[in-house]
Amino acid sequence: TITRGTLPPCAECAKAKAKQKNVRKIGISPKAEKPGERVYLDVSKVTVRQKNGGEYNLPNKWWCIIVDEATGKKYALFTRTKRGITEPVCEWMHRMNSRGIKIRRVRMDPGGENISLKKRTESVDWQALQPVDFEYTSRDTPQHNHLAEVAFPYLAALGRAMLDTAYVPEKERGRLIVYAIQLAVQLDGLRIVEMNGVVATRDEHMYGEKPKWTKNMKRFGECGVVKEGKNGKA
């Protein structure tokens, strides 16, 4: 005869059905309404592959992205090492303070380089940056740092598109990709967005005016003539 019994839990079945816990779509903390109230920060490694499957040896291969939550304004810093972002980020925060934009909160993952950044901002050398609150995201939850996470593929794609449009030779792509990404970051500041009912560029929301270099914009990859001599100008 067959009788009904009790079966122990199947560990293999539980592992097969396991998935990451859903992350709430609406955050608990209110969104920043002013420039500098909260910025998102993350670090990634830049890799540029060659046609033969190898990779270019980039001198500054570590890319630190900073995104202002209120305006969406992006900033890119490139360093030789992952922990090398500490000083450049402090210098960036100092430059923002000098322009009247105080950085209040920094959201980032609890990586070693980010913990070093927090300690550096609390040092005597950068005491003027205080007070700054650091918000650490949970492990394996890139959704909590989404503005920085999404900015990486977005800006990298723009950089590759610029190189392709300019027909940059294969041997020069590794040298120019960082420069192209930096230009893409600057051009993203000209994107028109709405903030508190005001429609303007990200730069205008951030600084109150458009950058002066917009009057002298040239197409990426355009040939130019450099005159040398006493009165030579590029």
Model regions and ranges:
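Short, intrinsically disordered/low-complexity patches at protein termini
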Residues: R99-G100, G159, R173
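Two-component system phosphotransfer/interaction surface
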Residues: F152, A156, Q182-V185
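Secondary-structure boundary/capping residues
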Residues: I101-K102, D164, G197
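Solvent-exposed, charged/polar functional surfaces in cytosolic regulatory/catalytic domains
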Residues: R95, L158, L187
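Retroviral integrase
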Residues: I2-L155, M206-A234
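Charged, gly/pro-enriched flexible loop segments at helix/strand junctions
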Residues: Y167-K230
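A polyampholytic, Gly/Pro-enriched intrinsically disordered region
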Residues: P153-A166
